[in-house]
């Protein structure tokens, strides 16, 4: 589709008038029609799922830790055959899942906020870490407990005109979600409220997603990671996608995007939402396109509106909508090396070219906002014209859309809708700062959400690395949410192993960014692991790592015996060449010889060498070279004498 858009560009008439003017949109009267649309959608999907045509096939497990079957198709979307993932205890040895209780003053609700406690040896205090793994040992057919039901019920009774976190924050109200996020981040709830009120942070939390454990996205908070999952027309199943959600969040994914484009889109999303404790985002244009049999020209506002309401009713926490792909911007991509690479962007662009009309998402932006502020669906304004290659980075088309994102952001804030802005893409490192600078300025410091960016195009199969480099860079500059890239990027649909690889790569990038921003928890985590490493507390080192399973398996490949877990060396250097063991020996020597500390031993050693240097003056140079100090260059005769 993107190719056909690219080929059609030269036929575009560029003298469009009045596109810069803000359209006059009628007041929305969406609410009376919501139930009708939802009922119609439910009826249609019920009919679609009555016929069974798929068969099951299996892939062999790719790791010892993943013995669950990887399904290619779903036989019965109403009752999938879910497979369990490895347990929390298997993934995180020496860790327990704990909860901190805090009381929401206004309601009296007791909130139980999760965290992961790593139990350390050697008298070291336990280390507490942010946890995204969600409730454990849950029957996926039943789904997670409805954590937020009482919170939502209480606020609904207040009869407020809007239901968004931004609305409450502007009123000076600290919601249960804000207190929950503040507790997770170890910050003052009032600070959370003020950042949400100013639009510098968002708490994606659809009032219909009752299973959600709230989290916050903003540049003054921990950098977060999003994991994309979803089926395609040729691969995956409901079982596999729910497994990916559970697996991604186990390893630290803070949000999930369901980008399904294949069969059972509605049912897949339903099962994901009922089993996800993290916010779930979508790109609604994908399902809208499926409703018109994949023909972009058959799309219209009514189909798109119906899809938005359907997904909001299910509990989707944020929508990616490419409303910044304007008709007049499409010709700007004509000379690109890779054209329009965004799926959503290309769909909107093709529709615009087919009718020579403005993007219907832009034209109906106020109507979209009216839907979002009734459910508290946050908007992730899509970057449909993002660069798809290093060659196209930071071009006119990309920044033209970003400027429009700023306009759409301010309009959303007027209706108390939470917003973040999506960013590139493929950008070399020296061009990354310009992206962050322009986004902060043009979008009034709304959270930035970037796909990487990939810093080079030469490494298919390793794009989780090429992009994590860019993600760490732009995260340190202020990007709040990093959309992961897996090793399969540009090659195929990622499986569960790819999902884990992508999440871990991006947790590294996010943590590196937190360190650069001098976040105190980030530094404490590094210090705890470094101390365990230096003291040869191998099990503590594994437990404190992002991926204990992999760290332990790599160590045990060459030193599998239990005794190796207490050895003061690894297979890299062996017992004689370990630098940390040598340093430990120096400290032990200093203590045994009464030097006190290693620092004192070093000081005394330097004093001794200084004295030896001064003695050299008396025995070699005498008055000929001055009365004080030794000589930098010793006479040849002295060297020969010393050698004898």
Curated annotation (Swiss-Prot):
Transit peptide: 1-54
Top-level EC class as recorded in UniProt: lyase
Annotated binding of [4Fe-4S] cluster, by residue: 570, 573, 578
Keyword GTP-binding listed: no
GO cellular component: chloroplast; chloroplast stroma; plastid
Tissue-specific expression: Strongly expressed in cotyledons, leaves, flowers and siliques, and, to a lower extent, in roots. Expressed in all green tissues, but not in roots, seeds, and petals.
Residue span of region Disordered: 55-83
Annotated Zn(2+) binding sites: 426, 490
KW Metal-binding (keyword) present: yes
UniProt keyword terms in alphabetical order: 4Fe-4S, Chloroplast, Iron, Iron-sulfur, Lyase, Metal-binding, Plastid, S-adenosyl-L-methionine, Thiamine biosynthesis, Transit peptide, Zinc
Reaction equation(s) it catalyzes: 5-amino-1-(5-phospho-beta-D-ribosyl)imidazole + S-adenosyl-L-methionine = 4-amino-2-methyl-5-(phosphooxymethyl)pyrimidine + CO + 5'-deoxyadenosine + formate + L-methionine + 3 H(+)
Stimuli inducing this protein: Circadian-regulation. Down-regulated by extrinsic thiamine, via a vitamin B1 derivative thiamine pyrophosphate (TPP)-sensing riboswitch regulation. Detected in both dark and light grown seedlings; increased progressively after transfer of etiolated seedlings to light. Up-regulated by salt, osmotic stress and abscisic acid.
Residues binding substrate: 228, 257, 286, 322, 342-344, 383-386, 422, 449
Pathway noted in the entry: Cofactor biosynthesis; thiamine diphosphate biosynthesis
Cofactor: [4Fe-4S] cluster
Domain of life: Eukaryota
Disruption of the gene: reported phenotype: Albino (white leaves) and lethal under normal culture conditions, probably due to an impairment in thiamine biosynthesis.
InterPro entries hit by this protein: ThiC, ThiC/Bza_core_dom, ThiC/BzaA/B
Family: Belongs to the ThiC family.
Identification of the protein by name: Phosphomethylpyrimidine synthase, chloroplastic
Source organism of the structure: Arabidopsis thaliana (Mouse-ear cress)
Name of the gene: THIC
């Amino acid at each position: 589709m993107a190719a056909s858009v690219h080929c059609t560009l030269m036929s575009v008439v560029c003298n469009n008038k009045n596109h810069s003017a803000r359209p006059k949109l009628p007041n929305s009267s969406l609410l009376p029609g919501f139930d009708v649309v939802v009922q119609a959608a439910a009826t249609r999907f019920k009919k679609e799922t009555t016929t069974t045509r798929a068969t099951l096939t299996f892939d062999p497990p790719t790791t010892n830790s993943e013995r669950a079957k990887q399904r290619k198709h779903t036989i019965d979307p109403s009752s999938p055959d879910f497979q369990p993932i490895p347990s929390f205890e298997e993934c995180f040895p020496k860790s327990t899942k704990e909860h901190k209780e805090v009381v929401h003053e206004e309601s009296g609700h007791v909130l139980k906020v999760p965290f992961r406690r790593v139990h350390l040896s050697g008298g070291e205090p336990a280390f507490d870490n942010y946890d995204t793994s969600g409730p454990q040992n849950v029957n996926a057919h039943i789904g997670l407990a409805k954590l937020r039901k009482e919170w939502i019920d209480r606020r609904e009774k207040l009869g407020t005109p809007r239901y968004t976190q931004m609305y409450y924050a502007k009123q000076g109200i600290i919601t249960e979600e804000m207190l929950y996020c503040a507790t997770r981040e170890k910050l003052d709830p009032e600070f959370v409220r003020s950042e949400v009120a100013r639009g510098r942070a968002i708490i994606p939390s659809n009032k219909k997603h009752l299973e959600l454990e709230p989290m916050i996205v903003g540049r003054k908070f921990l950098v977060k990671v999003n994991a994309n999952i979803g089926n395609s027309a040729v691969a995956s199943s409901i079982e596999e996608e729910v497994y990916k959600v559970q697996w991604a969040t186990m390893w630290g994914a803070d949000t999930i995007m369901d980008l399904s484009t294949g069969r059972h889109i509605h049912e897949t999303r339903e099962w994901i939402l009922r089993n996800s404790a993290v916010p779930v985002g979508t790109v609604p244009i994908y399902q809208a396109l499926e409703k018109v049999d994949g023909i972009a020209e058959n799309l219209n506002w009514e189909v798109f509106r119906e899809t938005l309401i359907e997904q909001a009713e299910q509990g989707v926490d944020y929508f990616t909508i490419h409303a910044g792909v304007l008709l007049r911007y499409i010709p700007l991509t004509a000379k690109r090396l890779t054209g329009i690479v965004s799926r959503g962007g290309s769909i909107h662009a093709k529709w615009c070219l087919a009718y020579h009309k403005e993007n219907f998402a832009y034209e109906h932006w106020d109507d979209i906002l009216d839907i979002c502020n009734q459910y508290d669906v946050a908007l992730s304004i899509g970057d449909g014209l993002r660069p798809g290659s290093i060659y196209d980075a930071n071009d006119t088309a990309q920044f033209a859309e970003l400027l429009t994102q700023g306009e759409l952001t301010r309009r959303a804030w007027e209706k108390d809708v939470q917003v973040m802005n999506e960013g590139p893409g493929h950008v070399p490192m020296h061009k990354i700062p310009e992206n962050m600078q322009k986004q902060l300025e043009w979008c009034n410091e709304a959270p930035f959400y970037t796909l990487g960016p990939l810093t080079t195009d030469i490494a298919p199969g390793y794009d989780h690395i090429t992009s994590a480099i860019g993600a760490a860079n732009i995260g340190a500059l202020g990007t709040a949410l990093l959309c992961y890239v897996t090793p399969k990027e540009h090659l195929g649909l990622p499986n569960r192993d790819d999902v884990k690889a992508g999440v871990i790569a991006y947790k590294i990038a996010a943590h590196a960014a937190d360190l650069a921003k001098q976040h105190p928890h980030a530094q404490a985590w590094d210090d705890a692991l470094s101390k365990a490493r230096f003291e040869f507390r191998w099990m503590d080192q594994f437990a404190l790592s992002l991926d204990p399973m992999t760290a332990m398996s790599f160590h045990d490949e060459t030193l599998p015996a239990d005794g190796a877990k207490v050895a003061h060396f690894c297979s890299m250097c062996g017992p004689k060449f370990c630098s940390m063991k040598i340093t430990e020996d120096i400290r032990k020597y200093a203590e045994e010889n009464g030097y006190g500390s290693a620092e004192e031993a070093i000081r005394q050693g330097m004093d001794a060498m200084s004295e030896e240097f001064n003695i050299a003056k008396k025995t070699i140079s005498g008055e000929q070279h001055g009365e004080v100090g030794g000589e930098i260059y010793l006479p040849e005769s002295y060297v020969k004498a010393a050698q004898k």
